[in-house]
Amino acid sequence: MLFGPRTRTPAEGRFSLRYVVATALTHGSVRLAAFEPARLNDPATRALMAKVAPSVDAELDATFPRQRAARVAITARGNREELLQPTRKGDPDLPLSDNELNDKFLELASPVLGKEQAQSLLKRLWKLECD
């Protein structure tokens, strides 16, 4: 399913490389909303999924799990761009900024706690001292 074209459910979307790549290119990021039914059926994302061709990079695969790198190559209008991302955003060697951490916390906690309680909890969490 990782490389497969099917994405009918949120679970399938989370494990479909074609879907998450097409979503990132279409919407700029892959956040919680990416797995809502309306997004899973977004025509622009679906059209782009057909053009995504995932493959395993043997060199990068050999470094897993020590390193979680990814390489992406995009060809558009006859031009090819390639990028190597040696680590995932949010890993210890490429941490989220405080603002990114706040946004992620509120995005995930607000549906469960409510917006006001999530904001209140976030303020309290930032006041905790680490030992």
Model-predicted regions and their roles:
Residues M1-D131:
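Terminal-appendage/accessory-domain detector
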